Amino acid sequence: TGGRLVHMAAADKINRLAQELVGRWGYSRIGPVAAPGAGESLRTLRSKYPQLFFLLDSYDYNNVSAKKCAAAFDKYGHGAAVLAGTKISQAWLAAQTDGYDYAEQAALAVERIQRNLTGSVTIL
């Protein structure tokens, strides 16, 4: 309403619903799915809603980086999860293999993604 952005209005609603669903680790059992393409929006959401758990979709997109995803995590490296299913399941296509070693290529893709994320997110 008014000058509010849609994702902020949605996060306000989720936050109201989540207040009584906070688990022992300090995060709610419900949270928003967020696109990490706009790192500054994630930074704003994280600072305003420290108890929401964020699910970051679209890590596979070209304009998304581990650095942008880092904005959704708290100072301990907690509070968010990154989805990269397409990047992982189609890793063998990028490697230009015959597809028989798909499990190995998927594992290598996971390792690359993990290295990228841990380079931008400090996990304590």
What are these regions (language model features)?
Residues L5, A9, E40, Y61-V64, ...:
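Conserved active-site and cofactor/substrate-binding residues in soluble primary-metabolism enzymes
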Residues P32, P36-L83, K87-A91:
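A C-terminal functional module that forms or caps the active site or interfaces directly
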Residues K68-G79, Q90-L124:
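C-terminal helical cap(s) of enzyme catalytic domains, especially alpha/beta-barrels
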